[in-house]
Amino acid sequence: MPTISKLMVALMATALVMSLAATAAADDSVAIEVRAIAASPDGDEFDSRLDDIEQRLERGFSDYSSFRQIDRHHKTIERDESAEFELPTGDVLVLSYNGRADDFVRLGLQLEDRFSTTLRATPGSTFFQAGLVYDESTLVLAITVE
């Protein structure tokens, strides 16, 4: 019987170590999706590729009635690293992954020399950054932390 007890303790210790290793590995990188959207007060076009965020766009950008996806990028960013996303305006968005804090992903967001901030987002959430002009529309960035 002592052998079974030792085996159980060894199995539990192995499971704990594997769980901690998986948690650490999950903390090493984050997947990000950036969608560039042209928003305009003219027309009523709504791009079906934006159906998953339609209500949030209409609520958050109620002055606009037309939303068209122009570009979409997926990148995985390693901890303490940055990734560049070229925008349709020619500007470059830089996102930095600064690790996790509790249930949040810590990100740095920089739009060349115009804007720089840090934020916390929950995995699976989408946040927006808007203000650049694109082809007589406002460029809205929908940034999803996957």
Give residue ranges: language-model regions.
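Bacterial N-terminal signal peptides that target proteins for export
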Residues: 1-11
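Classical N-terminal targeting signals for secretion and organelle import
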Residues: 2, 19-20
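Bacterial N-terminal signal peptides
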Residues: 9-19
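Sec/Tat signal peptide C-region and signal peptidase I cleavage site
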Residues: 20-26
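Outer membrane pore-forming secretion/assembly proteins and partners of Gram-negative envelopes
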Residues: 26-146
